[in-house]
Swiss-Prot record:
Assigned GO CC terms: cytosolic small ribosomal subunit
Official protein name in the record: Small ribosomal subunit protein uS9
Similarity comment: Belongs to the universal ribosomal protein uS9 family.
Family annotation (Gene3D superfamilies): 3.30.230.10
Record-linked HAMAP family: Ribosomal_uS9_B (MF_00532_B)
Keyword tags: Ribonucleoprotein, Ribosomal protein
UniProt xrefs under InterPro entries: Ribosomal_Su5_D2-typ_SF (IPR020568), Ribosomal_uS9 (IPR000754), Ribosomal_uS9_bac/plastid (IPR023035), Ribosomal_uS9_CS (IPR020574), Ribsml_uS5_D2-typ_fold_subgr (IPR014721)
Single Gene Ontology BP annotation: translation
């Protein structure tokens, strides 16, 4: 009886050791950059960050040129501002697919993930701000017998 109790205690100790949250480690390549992929709607962004002067390049162009609307530039800066790291990292990203709004959201998502790869201690702040969550909303498909996804054709009674 005591053997089974002892083995149960060992088993429960093993289970609690396994269920601990995984420790997030720093993931940096040989060039000192952290990499992550971000997605939003149809857009996919590949983002690399490294310590620097705060320069942001999107598809080999300055962020002010690529994203002309101030709202989109502000969206991209949000993770850096929330983590109090604005102007401390150089960001290089390539983004494809979707429109400008989706692309800005994809860059923001990728930048947040890259920041957590570079500094794992920022994960809590970024998670609380909702920057690490993939926005799963995508365009609803068009249905047959309808003008659009939900819009019906005009109905005439007579």
């Amino acid at each position: 009886m005591s053997d089974t109790m002892q083995s149960l205690d060992q088993l429960s100790a093993l289970k609690t050791a396994e269920s601990e949250a995984p420790k997030h480690t720093k993931k940096i390549d040989k060039y000192g950059r952290a990499y992550a992929t971000g997605k939003r709607k149809d857009a996919v962004a590949r983002v690399w960050i490294k310590p620097g002067a705060g320069k942001i390049l999107v598809n080999a162009r300055e962020v002010e040129v690529y994203f002309a609307r101030p709202v989109l530039r502000m969206m991209i800066q949000q993770p850096l501002v929330a983590a109090a790291r604005a102007g401390q990292y150089d960001v290089v990203c390539t983004v494809a697919g979707g429109g400008l709004s989706g692309q800005a959201g994809a860059v923001r998502h990728g930048l947040s993930k890259a920041l957590t790869n570079f500094e794992p201690e920022l994960r809590g702040v970024l998670k609380k701000g909702g920057f690490l969550t993939r926005d799963s909303r995508v365009v609803e498909r068009k249905k047959y017998g309808k003008a659009k996804a939900r819009r019906s054709f005009q109905f005439s009674k007579r």
